[in-house]
Amino acid sequence: MKKTLALLLAAVMLLSVLAACSSKAETPAEPEQTTEEPAQTPDAPAEETTEETTAAEEPSQEELDQAAADEVAAMIDAIYVQTRTNETDAQCEAAKAAWDALTDAQKALVEGDEASPDYFGLDTGDASKDDPRNQDDIGENELLVVSFGTSFNDSRVADIKGIEDALQEANPDWSVRRAFTAQIIINHIQARDGEKIDNMTQALDRAVANGVKNLVVQPTHLMHGAEYDEMCEALEQYKDKFESVAIAEPMLGEVGSDATVINADKEAVAKAITAAAVADSGFESVDAAKEAGTAFVFMGHGTAHVAKVTYSQMQAQMQQLGYENVFIGTVEGEPEETSAEAVIEAVKAAGYTNVILRPLMVVAGDHANNDMAGSEDDSWKTMFEAAGFT
């Protein structure tokens, strides 16, 4: 009986303890709710945090400037192409409008795969002095002058337009028209200056639409290179649309099988460019320049095309004419003996101390202004000066 009573008392005590513990554990729950409510009451700190976050998310002026410049760079890259599309006109116009809307600071930030501030910002002369020669009313006889092209306005007016004007004067019964083979140049001129120049397809379509019967194509290309080949391929598609088609030779004539095969065209050009270089530099003759330790270096473009032997032929022609202080080089270094490094070594080995650089190109455009006479470390002028020449 006593044991039973003891067990009952123990059970009652255990239940009391458990109830007390349960009561103590639940009691703080109310204060927890009470303490949380005051923490939510003040609204001011939360608003300040939101304002600070919004301010931090707003782009800086520098970021806005870069974004505007990047947009224009993308538009330039889009028109910096070799093919023309139905969108080209609109793209050129939109890119120029976007450029004009930039501040000077934003224009300086324009950089893309091909884009730079110079695309629109470089002053190359007055484009209004040029004549794109893309007019209709051609007549039955057309003389189509085909050039690679240049975006340098002054050079285009002096060189390409100069050739076209001379041909028109010499052939008054023929209508002289123009075509460029470099769509990249055509797009650049159109976007920057609003001047539209025909590519080969446009020029030939124009001739057909105007009822041209006799077509003579005169390239201003230096030699039978890739551009000349592409021109001939384009003409092949239109031969049956005219009564007669004639294609003239490039300036240096036939390529020849090797460096020893030199034609009359190369001889005439070699004499003409050397005489002009001698006269412009103030010497009485090429021999007088030689006596003064002066060498003339003519820089061509260069090519991986089989026609690259033309440059070797021109060097051989200079030697045959007795022009020992005249050297032929190329921007591309093709063929290898025409690279800047190779020519510098050749001039140095011959003992000359003064060098006069001249372009071996129909147009003194980007290559002549930058690759030859520019101030960059890889320009020929800089490289010759670094080698100790004056």
Task: Name each region found by the language model.
Residues 1-9:
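Positively charged n-region of N-terminal signal peptides that target proteins for export
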Residues 16-20:
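C-terminal motif of bacterial Sec signal peptides marking the signal peptidase cleavage site
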Residues 22-24:
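Bacterial signal peptide processing site
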Residues 32-39:
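Short extracytoplasmic/periplasmic juxtamembrane "stem" segments immediately C-terminal to an N-terminal membrane anchor
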Residues 39-75, 116-142:
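N-terminal low-complexity, Pro/Thr/Ser-rich intrinsically disordered segments
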Residues 58-124:
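Beta-rich interaction/scaffold domains
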Residues 62, 118-356, 362-390:
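Extended amphipathic ligand-handling, pore-lining, and cofactor/metal-binding catalytic surfaces
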